[in-house]
């Protein structure tokens, strides 16, 4: 996601967090945790440390409150990325492993693949090319098993860049 696209998305979503109340009917308005999740996912893709620092802890809080395991996994992954961007590699690994465990337990293959990609990025930050190849390879397998062509292609490109 380009920085300009992320800025537009953020401009559109942040005001929704100021709205009070819950939807009158299911599906008529995004819940706070849904808006936070969208901001966190976009910030993760944009590698925006400031937005991750602002919304990932909130998403984690809301996911724990609501017992929403998919959003909790997304929050852990986002916090892992934020820690990696800040150079806090041990904290990043802990968060990414928490996310991976949650997603594997839910058999959420696409989320598993995305988390494995982030673990590969962490490996690269540690200059551990062999581990990165392993994580990218497992991510590629997950994406191919699902037919997630765009993610599989991005992963192939990442693999080619380090071969």
Segments from the language model and where they lie:
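Helix-coil-helix junctions within alpha-helical repeat/solenoid scaffolds
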Residues: 1-163
């Amino acid at each position: 996601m380009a920085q300009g696209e992320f800025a537009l998305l953020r401009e559109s979503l942040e005001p929704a967090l100021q709205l009070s109340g819950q939807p009158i009917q299911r599906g008529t308005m995004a819940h706070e945790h849904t808006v936070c999740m969208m901001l966190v996912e976009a910030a993760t893709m944009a590698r925006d440390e400031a937005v991750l620092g602002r919304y990932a802890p909130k998403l984690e809080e809301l996911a724990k409150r609501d017992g929403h395991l998919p959003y909790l996994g997304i929050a852990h992954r986002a916090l892992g990325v934020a820690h990696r961007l800040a150079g806090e590699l041990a904290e990043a690994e802990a968060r990414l492993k928490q996310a991976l465990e949650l997603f594997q337990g839910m058999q959420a293959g696409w989320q598993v693949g995305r988390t494995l990609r982030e673990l590969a990025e962490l490996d690269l930050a540690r200059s551990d090319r062999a581990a990165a190849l392993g994580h990218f390879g497992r991510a590629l397998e997950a994406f191919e098993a699902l037919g997630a062509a765009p993610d599989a292609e991005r992963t192939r490109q990442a693999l080619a860049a380090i071969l």
